[in-house]
Structure formats: C-alpha cells, structure tokens
C-alpha cells in the first residue's frame, strides 16, 4: 500500500471531476503533478502542487484551482482536511483511519510492504567491484562492493530482474606482474632469498600462493627462463587471486551471479565483432587526434590510429580503439565487453566504478549508446574514497597487503553488518570517513547502532509482553483494535512508515541505495522518540495494563521493526534481536 500514490490518484480523480464539470479544460498534462511530504511538517501530512502545475495550461489562477480541488478532496474519507496555502499550494491532513490502514497493510504484507513493481521485470545488469585479480580487495573496493550489492538488492525489491556481475581484468599486463611476483614467492618457498623489484606485488598474501605452486609443480620452474613458466603461472595466480577475492566478497555477504573474464574477449573474435558493429554504423575511422592539453592520456599517439567517433554520442573527443602498431587500446576490450552485455538482452546497464575512473564515463556511455542504437541506457556510478581512522589517527597499514587496508581488515574489526551500513551512510560520490571506534559506539551519532537498537527494542518489548502472558503473534497483532492508537506521536510513527513505499521507488529510480540507510535512521529516530516519551507520558508506553491496548501498541512497534528489517535486507544487514 503506497498511500502517497493513492493520494496522487485521488488528486487526479478530483481533477477529472473538475474537467467533467467544465471547471478545467480536457487533455491537461498530469505528469508533473506530485503528492509528497511538505517541507514543513506543521503544514500537514502531505502536499500537492496540482494547482500550481495546471494553472498556466488551464488559463486559471492557481489559488482558484486549489480551492476547488480542496473541496473535492475534503469529501474523501481518507482526508481529514485540505487547506490552500500561499499562491496555490494544497496541504492535506490524513484521517486517522487512513493511517491505521497503512499500519494494517504493513502487518499483513510483512517485509513485502513497500516492494514495488516499477521495474516490471526489466533486465538490468549491475557490474561492480571488478578489481584487478592481483591481490586482496582493499577498502575502496569494499565501498564499491557494498554500494553495488545494495543497489542490486534495491532494484530487485523494486521489480527489476537483476544480474550481479564482476568483470575479471585478467587480460592486461598487471597479470604478468602478478605472475612474476608469485614466481618470486615460489622461489622463496624453495629456500631462495629473493628481492622484489619496484612494480611487483610484495604483500604477504602471495606467500601461501608460492607455497601452493611449489606443492603442485615441485622444482620444475626453478632456474627456468620466464617464457617457460609465465603463462602457466599467470593462469594459476589469477585463479588463486579470484579464489581470494570471492572469499573476501563472501565475508562481506556479496555473491555474484556472473564472473566475466576479459581474457575471453581476446582471440575469440569478440573485440573484432564489436568494432565491426561500430564500423558498420560509420563510427570507426583512421585519423590523428589533436594533442591533448595538459597530461597526455596513455592511449594518445602523435600518429594515425583507428578511432571511434564517440563525439557523435556525447563524448568530448573521439577515442582510439587500435594503436598505430595494430594492437588494441585498453578501451577496445571494454567496448567488446559492453557489446556482449547489450547482446545478452539487458534493458539497462549500471557500472559501479571508483572515483579515479571519472574520466572514463563519457566514452563508455558513448560506446553503449552507439552499440545499442540508443536503446540501452548506461548509468555509471562513481564511489568516492574512504578515509579510515582509529584512535583518532589515520589508519593506513595492513599486515596482509603491506601497503593498504584490505576488505578483510575492515570486516574482521567491525563485522560485515557494520561495514555494510557505514559504507551507505553517505551518497556514493561523497567522501566517507570510517572511524573504527565511532562505528562501534552505542550512541545516536552512530547510525548503525541507532537503527539496530530500534529493531532490538521492538524484539525486547515483545518478549516482555509475552512474559506477561499477552499474545503478540502476528495473527493476534493483525486483529488488534488499532483505533486505540490515537496519540499524535503514534500516528506520526505510522506516517513515517507510510513513506517507505515511496522512498523505495525514489531510491530505485535514482539508483541511490543510501536513501534507504537515511530513511532507516529517520524512522528509528521517530520510533526512539515515541519510546522515550513513554518515560514521561505513561499512556505512550508499549506495555500497558490492558492487554488490548498493549497489543495495539505492539502492533505499531512490530510494524516499525518489519520496515526496518525490509530496509536492512536491501542493505544486506542482519537485523539485531538484542544489543550486546
């Protein structure tokens, strides 16, 4: 039950009545008519801009339309009052019976309350993490993993058919560097002293990989030239790193549907097919790009290259796809990979990149636009840096990696639930401070604790009621006399619950799962406020002498915990039954 959607439908119904009565012209565009929470809660429960939107096309004063609308709206049993404000805004107060219907809907649907169908089964591919398979995931990958996973869950909750995908960057030179680094650990496992040249990977995480290689191959690679072992160790090391990465992701509660290998694009004709598709559309040509101003990108050459006319699809400059020596640029396999995604029949694509890939956005969007003839939108979400603090100081070192803090470092210290929630307490493109001490504090300033405490409080009050012999099973709560909930603080909590379905749709349309975390914090604040008022106003306490009153109040508390559980489920966080 989406009360905001119901009220918007009611507003449009009243507009139709005005059209029928000759008060408004027919064929008005209703697209921009909204019903939403007012900026100032003192003005009402909801507000509509209908009169302001329709005034100009109708050739009438907005206030005149608003006053006529107010009369029609006030006749509906769900509306307690409809008041015109300013030049033509319309503020609505919802009748208590309508609020109680929302509460009953929450109890009836459980965590499906708020589940939407705006996706209508459209296929969406969400690609995230996609870290180079050269070592354990670091804290930056952690943020991308959590954001992408929560976004995928949000879209699933909103009715989309979602595929979670990881692109394995196993086709580039960095995997050769990994193989050489593993070879050094392999020699070390044979008792040799080795030095790690600049540019190799010296982290301790490769020590067991070197030992595993020794166990598998014995001394067959010792003293051999690079060409004798590079390709074998390349494959062995990549597989070992992907096992490590999969384990890292699992520790965070992230599981992918698809792992797609970049290497599979080479020697299979897939890159050639993608470039040929662009060529058939007149978007590939040979030419020399103007020297770029400032820092020169690695794919620029002062010679003729094969170029993609990305400027015809919104990019700033055309992009090289083949170098003058006939080898592919790093952009070419990315084009081929997205060509494959388009070919798999997705209705929309989402890529989650680190902020350092900001310069890649326009060219990638141009490629997908060209490959899909503008039919498949690509949204690229950038996740900003995470700054870690411990004991008030920046925290930068890792025993595992030697140079950076790993995902496992974070999960081991605070657990997956805290790590996931905190990563969503800021919009993805805003810097995030992660303080290991503060995220474990039991205070309002710690949003993880604040939300989990609300859920745990409901569980505790239900246990208390059961101990007093009061039935609080779901069937009993659904049958409770909800008319006993009439205090403005109780109705205010229901009003906040009513925002959940609208919030889900808004967050899903904008691909912004952080909105769920923000809402849960606000909802928990309203719940804690009601709980704390019970200290001064005894009739607001959830457990009363009268079992029927207790059941009604616990029905409200239970509905709150249901919505919190639904939101935490989207974020990939397990709701707490008690605080420890």
Swiss-Prot record:
What top-level branch of life does the organism fall under? Bacteria
* UniProt-listed GO biological process terms: arginyl-tRNA aminoacylation
What PROSITE patterns does the entry give?
AA_TRNA_LIGASE_I
Keywords attached to this Swiss-Prot or TrEMBL record, sorted alphabetically, are: Aminoacyl-tRNA synthetase, ATP-binding, Cytoplasm, Ligase, Nucleotide-binding, Protein biosynthesis
What does the record give as the reaction this protein catalyses? tRNA(Arg) + L-arginine + ATP = L-arginyl-tRNA(Arg) + AMP + diphosphate
Q: Which Pfam families match?
A: Arg_tRNA_synt_N, DALR_1, tRNA-synt_1d
Q: What EC number(s) has UniProt assigned to this enzyme?
A: 6.1.1.19
Q: What class of enzyme is it?
A: ligase
Motif 'HIGH' region: residue span?
131-141
Which InterPro entries does the entry mention?
aa-tRNA-synth_I_CS, Arg-tRNA-ligase, Arg-tRNA-synth_N, Arg-tRNA-synth_N_sf, ArgRS_core, DALR_anticod-bd, Rossmann-like_a/b/a_fold, tRNAsynth_Ia_anticodon-bd
Q: Which GO terms describe its cellular component?
A: cytoplasm
PANTHER family, alphabetized: ARGININE--TRNA LIGASE, CYTOPLASMIC (PTHR11956:SF5), ARGINYL-TRNA SYNTHETASE (PTHR11956)
Protein family per UniProt: Belongs to the class-I aminoacyl-tRNA synthetase family.
**Quaternary organization:** Monomer.
Provide the protein name.
Arginine--tRNA ligase
- Organism, by scientific name, is Roseobacter denitrificans (strain ATCC 33942 / OCh 114) (Erythrobacter sp. (strain OCh 114))
Encoding gene per record? argS
């Amino acid at each position: 039950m989406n009360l905001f959607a119901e009220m918007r439908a009611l507003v449009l119904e009243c507009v139709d009545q005005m059209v029928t009565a000759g008060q408004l012209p027919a064929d008005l565009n209703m697209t921009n008519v909204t019903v939403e929470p007012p900026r100032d809660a003192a003005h009402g429960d909801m507000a509509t801009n209908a009169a302001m939107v329709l005034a100009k096309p109708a050739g009438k004063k907005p206030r005149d339309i608003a006053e006529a609308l107010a009369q029609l709206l006030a006749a509906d049993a769900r509306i307690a009052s409809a008041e015109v404000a300013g030049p033509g805004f319309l503020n609505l107060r919802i009748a208590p019976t309508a609020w109680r219907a929302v509460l009953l809907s929450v109890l009836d649907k459980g965590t499906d309350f708020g589940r939407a169908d705006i996706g209508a089964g459209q296929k969406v591919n969400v690609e995230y993490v996609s870290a180079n398979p050269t070592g354990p995931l670091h804290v930056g990958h952690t943020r991308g993993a959590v954001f992408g996973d929560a976004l995928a869950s949000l879209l699933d909750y909103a009715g989309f058919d979602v595929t979670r995908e990881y692109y394995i960057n196993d086709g580039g030179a960095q995997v050769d560097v990994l193989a050489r680094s593993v070879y050094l650990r392999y020699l070390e496992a044979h008792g040799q002293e080795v030095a790690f040249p600049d540019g190799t990977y010296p982290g301790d995480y490769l020590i067991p990989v070197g030992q595993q290689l020794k166990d598998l191959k014995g001394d067959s690679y010792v003293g051999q030239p690079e060409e004798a072992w590079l390709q074998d160790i390349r494959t062995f090391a990549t597989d070992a790193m992907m096992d490590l990465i999969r384990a890292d992701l699992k520790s965070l509660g992230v599981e992918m549907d698809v792992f797609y290998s970049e290497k599979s694009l080479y020697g299979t004709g897939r890159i050639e097919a993608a470039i040929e598709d662009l060529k058939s559309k007149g978007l590939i040509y040979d030419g020399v790009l103007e020297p770029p101003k400032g820092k020169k990108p690695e794919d620029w050459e002062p010679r003729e290259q094969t170029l993609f006319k990305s400027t015809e699809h919104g990019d700033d400059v055309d992009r090289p796809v083949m170098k003058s020596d006939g080898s592919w640029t790093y952009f070419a396999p990315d084009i081929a990979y997205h060509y494959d995604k388009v070919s798999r029949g997705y209705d929309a694509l989402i890529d989650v990149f680190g902020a350092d890939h900001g310069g890649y956005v326009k060219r990638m969007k141009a490629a997908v636009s060209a490959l899909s003839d503008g039919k498949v939108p690509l949204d690229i979400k950038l996740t900003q840096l995470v700054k870690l603090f411990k004991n008030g100081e920046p925290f930068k070192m890792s025993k595992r990696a030697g140079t950076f803090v790993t995902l496992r470092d974070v999960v081991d210290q605070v657990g997956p639930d805290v790590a996931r929630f905190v990563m969503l307490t800021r919009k993805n493109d805003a810097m995030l401070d992660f303080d290991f001490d503060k995220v474990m504090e039991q205070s309002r300033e710690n949003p993880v604790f604040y939300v989990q405490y609300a859920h745990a409080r409901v569980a505790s009050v239900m246990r208390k009621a059961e101990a007093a012999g009061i039935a609080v099973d779901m069937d009993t709560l659904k049958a409770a006399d909800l008319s006993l909930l009439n205090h403005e603080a109780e109705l205010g909590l229901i009003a906040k619950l009513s925002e959940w379905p609208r919030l889900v749709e808004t967050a899903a349309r904008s691909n912004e799962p952080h909105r769920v975390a923000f809402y849960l914090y606000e909802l928990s604040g309203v719940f804690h406020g009601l709980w704390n008022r019970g200290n001064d106003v005894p009739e607001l306490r959830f457990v009363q002498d009268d079992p029927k009153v207790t059941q009604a109040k616990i029905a409200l508390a239970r509905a709150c915990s249901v919505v919190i559980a639904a939101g935490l489920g989207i974020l990939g966080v397990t709701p707490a039954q008690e605080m420890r």
